[in-house]
Amino acid sequence: MKADKDTFVLIHGKQGIMSHTATANLPSLLAIAKRYRMERLWINADRAKSLGLKDGDLVEISSPLATKKIHIMVTERIHPEAAFIPGGYGNASPRLKTGYGFGISPNDFTPSRVEPISGQAMMMEVLVKIRKVGD
């Protein structure tokens, strides 16, 4: 997959303090995540600069399945063609009262596809577009 100027390969993973929906609903862990803005979308510094983006900017990320808004973290610690969303955020159930509405979920952008040989979910084969919103 080759990404063009505003297209990225969406990747996701866990963070040291967050692992699943349940941990995002724990007040002490969510307080840490909010304090350090851990829900942000990671984008490579060179790619961000080419799109006129700065650390903390609000962007719109979209795939054929979803469009969401999220603030970005500009970093050298990611491949230029990738955008990273930490997992565990973006809880859609209002019953998860603590974590509800915080961050976005990579699952919202990911179609239900299975790799035919291994039977694993194809969750890292998603292309997304990213553009700045607001000022």
Protein language model regions, located:
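Long, low-complexity segments enriched in small/aliphatic residues
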Residues: 1-31
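Long, contiguous, secondary-structure-rich segments that constitute the structural scaffold
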Residues: 21, 26-42, 46-135
